Regions:
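Active-site beta-loop-alpha junctions enriched in small/polar residues
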Residues: 24-26, 49-51, 109-111, 135-137, ...
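Active-site beta->alpha loop and helix N-cap motifs at the rims of alpha/beta catalytic domains
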Residues: 69-175, 181-185, 189
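Alpha/beta catalytic cores of nucleotide-metabolism and tRNA/nucleoside-modifying enzymes
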Residues: 1-25, 30-31, 38, 81-83, ...
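Non-cysteine beta-strand/loop elements that form the S-adenosyl-L-methionine
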Residues: 46, 129-138, 198-209, 262-269
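Conserved radical SAM core fold
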Residues: 49-55, 134-148, 205-213
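Catalytic beta/alpha-barrel core
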Residues: 107, 133, 152-154, 205-209, ...
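Glycine-rich, positively charged N-terminal anion/phosphate-binding segment
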Residues: 2-13, 26-122
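Short beta-strand segments at enzyme active-site cores
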Residues: 46, 130-134, 172-180, 203-207, ...
Length: 437
């Protein structure tokens, strides 16, 4: 039976036939996505980023990393009138347009149609699609009415999707999709999915676990065929997520359940070559993965804490290199510990210097605080001086009648005319013009 297919926008991507990197908070940053693409991922999802975190950011082209950075300053100094002088600028979202621009899906955390549209509109020109997170069970997401909490407020979820389709998808010619979890009963899940596919989305991903379930619990696929059928009736692509460990397994599950694609999460966190089929080489050794990950991490100057976390997932816990890596404080030290070669070690040293990490002396929190305090005091003094100048009587601000405008012919050197050169300013001769002083 032939099913209808919703049209894919000009700049969007079709999820059908795709094995993709799942959105993961710490494991979906720029170098992880680039590594997944290198080893065969068809599309990559970025980590859930809250709409309010992106709103207020400045889009910057980074000539050093060749990335597009969305950055912002802390609100602390600004709200106390100190401006941004002396503050560190934080990177909220970083993407590599040349490598991943046409394959990157931005996942948004939101609970409001208006802020969702505002944030998504900022990044839409740089990505291939916007995906709404309606499945994250973590408190940082659900307490704000986002993530899996949206499953309990279907009216709000549908309103968000409809607003994004109309105001962002149509205007920027990209697709809008949603990622959900299954509900407790088949009937409840079907009712929800039927509403979602009618909002104008181009794709739906289902994580085959309920909200209370955790990754260690086995995925439930009993409802999957029903969800696939509902999506296909509406012409929507359906992806599955949960306990998918490799490309070959994903293809097998797609055939078994009829899904259009699959997401890989935990397995990709440990070894991104899981996106490569056995016939193309299968899993690469961890040493290769660690080296390639380090290369990407340094090229985009990834935050060191995130890089170290990912290396801890990639390097087996019992390997001597794992313990050596755990003691490192920056890229240079870990490049030496992993024996990555002269080229990468040299790159690591330069990255550490730019990021002020590792063996490079880093400005302490107390030093930054003191610098910010001085900047705030200076700004306050300037404001007070400006205010005082405005209130000063006009006559007192005018020039005194007795004051004379300095002229060249009355300028004099304050020393005897017969002074020797050795006793005067080093480069001034007796015949020099007073203008040269």
């Amino acid at each position: 039976m032939t099913h209808p297919r919703v049209p894919i926008p000009k700049r969007g991507v079709d999820y059908r036939g795709k094995i993709v990197l799942a959105p993961m908070v710490r494991s979906g940053e720029c170098p992880s996505r680039l590594l997944a693409l290198k080893y065969g991922a068809d599309l990559v999802w970025g980590p859930e980023t809250i709409d309010k975190a992106l709103i207020g950011c400045t889009r910057r082209l980074n000539p050093i990393t060749n990335t597009v950075d969305f950055t912002r300053y802390s609100n602390n100094g600004v709200k106390h009138g100190g401006g941004t002088e002396g503050q560190r600028e934080s990177v909220i979202y970083r993407l590599h347009p040349e490598i991943e621009g046409t394959k990157l899906i931005y996942q948004i955390g939101t609970s409001d149609p208006e802020t969702a549209v505002q944030a998504a509109s900022m990044i839409a020109p740089d990505v291939a699609g916007i995906d709404v997170n309606a499945g994250c069970p973590k408190p940082f997401s659900t307490t704000g009415g986002m993530g899996a909490a949206l499953l309990k407020t279907p009216d709000k979820l549908c309103a968000i999707l409809e607003a994004l389709v109309k105001e962002v998808g149509n205007k920027h010619e990209i697709g809008i999709s949603v990622k959900i979890r299954i509900l407790d009963t088949l009937e409840d899940t079907e009712k929800l999915v039927r509403r979602l596919v009618a909002t104008g989305i181009t794709g739906l991903t289902v994580h085959c676990r309920t909200t209370p379930m955790r990754p260690r619990e086995r995925a439930i696929r009993d409802q999957l065929r029903m969800i696939v059928n509902v999506c296909h009736e509406a012409g929507i692509a359906c992806l599955m997520n949960g306990d998918v460990t490799s490309r070959d397994e994903a293809l097998q599950l797609m055939q078994e359940y009829g899904t259009d694609g699959a997401m890989i999460a935990t397995a990709a966190e440990k070894n991104s070559s899981c996106f490569r089929s056995e016939k193309d080489g299968g899993l690469a050794p961890w040493q290769e993965i660690a080296k390639e990950y380090m290369r990407f991490a340094m090229e985009v100057e990834n935050r060191w804490g995130n890089t170290k976390f990912l290396l801890a997932q990639i390097i087996p816990g019992k390997a001597p290199a794992h313990q050596a890596m755990a003691k490192t404080r920056g890229y240079f030290e870990v490049a030496q510990a992993l024996e990555l070669g002269d080229e990468l070690i040299a790159l690591a040293k330069s990255v550490d210097e730019r990021l002020e990490i590792g063996v490079v002396k880093k400005e302490t929190k107390a030093e930054r605080k003191a610098k910010n305090k001085v900047a705030q005091q200076t700004a306050q003094e300037k404001r007070e001086q400006k205010a005082a100048a405005k209130t000063m009587p006009r006559t007192s601000r005018s020039r005194s009648p007795a004051a004379k405008k300095r002229k060249v012919d009355i300028g004099e050197l304050n020393m005897p005319l017969d002074v020797s050169r050795e006793m005067g300013p080093g480069t001034v001769t007796g015949q020099a013009s007073t203008l040269a002083v």
